[in-house]
Amino acid sequence: STKNGRDSNSKRLGVKVYGNQPIKKGGIIIRQRGLTFKPGINVAVGKDYTLFALQEGDVKFETIANRKFVSVIK
């Protein structure tokens, strides 16, 4: 027998909706571990650092002072 015989399930992290794409209220934009992307306008953070839309609109990514922000613009 071997000591290496195990693996964890993938957590399906990453960007779910990309820039300039439409999103509905409550739609998930990014699943992440920690705040790699920070919430901008009309975006909120879930308890597992998931970013989701507070309003309907188009997703916009921007970098300000070396920080990545995600916003939802009408």
From Swiss-Prot:
PROSITE patterns: RIBOSOMAL_L27. One of its GO terms (molecular function) is structural constituent of ribosome. Gene3D superfamilies: 2.40.50.100. This is Large ribosomal subunit protein bL27c. It comes from Pleurochrysis haptonemofera (Unicellular marine alga). The lineage of its organism: Eukaryota, Haptista, Haptophyta, Prymnesiophyceae, Coccolithales. It comes from the Eukaryota. InterPro entries: Ribosomal_bL27, Ribosomal_bL27_CS. GO terms for biological process: translation. PANTHER family: LARGE RIBOSOMAL SUBUNIT PROTEIN BL27M, RIBOSOMAL PROTEIN L27. GO terms for cellular component: chloroplast; ribonucleoprotein complex; ribosome. Keywords: Chloroplast, Plastid, Ribonucleoprotein, Ribosomal protein. It is found in: Plastid, Chloroplast. Belongs to the bacterial ribosomal protein bL27 family.
